[in-house]
């Protein structure tokens, strides 16, 4: 019997976002700018948090890891997409395609867990401030961050295992700008009735668990804020949560639509647009969201600029 993971297709061709040459040039300039802002913004967040003692707190530790994950997430996809905009045929071996998807899923899943951890951090800070140093000790923070990366690797392993047992013996053109699971699955000549469901269950479980943690955390946060007598205290508590809630809404909204909703509910073009949003745009927006609305980050940035340009 032929091995189940035997493939006759040796490489995949990524069709990208568009075949229009003029539009490709425009998109190249736009996405090059977005990628540059992503790298500069997230590296700035990381260096700022590491260099400023006032930002050496659990919240900013998690934010620095979120910035690192955003860099990895965007870098796993954007450079290859930019190559396609230059008019080159983007060809990836099956192994390279699987590797790209594996890396992207790892970072994407870690981001889910980090957003949940950050919600728990805000819950402890606002609802149990006297116990904050105990509940968010360096050891616990290390465990939470480590568990986020382990969870990302486990989910990525589930998706990757499903890809590796597929056979590809027909068309090799992926109608996408990266090796996304649904797009690759369409090219398989294997029975995908079960394989197509397993990753959705894995991704759906992670989304449900992390959203539950976030929802419960913010329910208690809201109750605590409403019971505050001080208007200033309420405003300060709300201001520390709005940035995180914005990031959560943007990220979870898109990944739920792509990986959990039935595929018949949207077209390939809509899938591409949503994928651009969560793989390219959101990693650029996160440092802006967290810095523009955060007084501590803005103050640390001001001091850093003064040190560099006295």
From Swiss-Prot:
Membrane-protein topology: Multi-pass membrane protein
Keyword tags: Cell membrane, Disulfide bond, G-protein coupled receptor, Glycoprotein, Membrane, Olfaction, Receptor, Sensory transduction, Transducer, Transmembrane, Transmembrane helix
Chief place where the protein resides: membrane
Membrane-crossing segments per the record: 26-46, 55-75, 100-120, 134-154, 197-217, 238-258, 272-292
Any one biological process term the GO annotation gives: sensory perception of smell
Topological domains annotated Cytoplasmic: 47-54, 121-133, 218-237, 293-310
PROSITE patterns per the UniProt record, alphabetical: G_PROTEIN_RECEP_F1_1, G_PROTEIN_RECEP_F1_2
Annotated disulfide bonds: 97-189
Sugar-bearing residue positions: 5, 20, 265
Places the protein is found: Cell membrane
Superkingdom per UniProt: Eukaryota
Extracellular-side positions: 1-25, 76-99, 155-196, 259-271
Gene Ontology CC entries for this record: membrane; plasma membrane
Coiled coil residues, start to end: none
Entry's Gene Ontology molecular function annotations: G protein-coupled receptor activity; olfactory receptor activity
InterPro entries named in the record: GPCR_Rhodpsn, GPCR_Rhodpsn_7TM, Olfact_rcpt
UniProt function note: Potential odorant receptor.
Family in the record: Belongs to the G-protein coupled receptor 1 family.
Protein name as catalogued: Olfactory receptor 5P56
Organism, as annotated: Mus musculus (Mouse)
Upper taxonomic lineage: Eukaryota, Metazoa, Chordata, Craniata, Vertebrata
């Amino acid at each position: 019997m032929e091995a189940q993971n035997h493939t006759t297709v040796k490489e995949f061709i990524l069709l990208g976002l568009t075949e229009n040459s003029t539009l490709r040039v425009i998109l190249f300039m736009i996405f090059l700018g977005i990628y540059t802002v992503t790298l500069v913004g997230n590296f700035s967040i990381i260096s700022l948090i590491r260099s400023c003692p006032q930002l050496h707190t659990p919240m900013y530790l998690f934010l620095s890891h979120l910035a690192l994950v955003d860099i990895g997430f965007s870098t796993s996809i954007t450079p290859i997409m930019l190559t396609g905009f230059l008019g080159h045929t983007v060809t990836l071996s099956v192994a390279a395609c699987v590797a790209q998807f594996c890396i992207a899923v790892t970072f994407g899943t870690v981001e889910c867990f980090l957003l949940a951890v950050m919600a728990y951090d805000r819950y402890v800070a606002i609802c149990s401030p006297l116990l904050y140093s105990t509940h968010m000790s360096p050891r616990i923070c290390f465990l939470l961050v480590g568990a986020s990366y382990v969870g990302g690797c486990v989910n990525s392993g589930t998706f990757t295992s499903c890809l590796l047992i597929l056979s590809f013996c027909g068309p090799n053109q992926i109608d996408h700008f990266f090796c996304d699971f649904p797009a690759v699955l369409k090219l398989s000549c294997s029975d995908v009735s079960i394989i197509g469901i397993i990753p959705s269950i894995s991704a759906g479980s992670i989304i449900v668990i992390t959203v539950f943690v976030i929802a419960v955390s913010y329910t208690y946060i809201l109750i605590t804020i409403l019971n505050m007598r001080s208007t200033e205290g309420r405003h300060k508590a709300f201001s520390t949560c709005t940035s995180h809630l914005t990031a959560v809404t943007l990220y979870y909204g898109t990944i739920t639509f792509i990986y959990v909703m039935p595929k018949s509910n949207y077209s390939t073009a809509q899938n591409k647009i949503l994928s651009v949003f969560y793989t390219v745009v959101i990693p650029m927006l996160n440092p802006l969201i967290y810095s523009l609305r955060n007084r501590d980050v803005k103050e640390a940035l001001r001091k850093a600029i003064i040190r560099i340009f006295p």
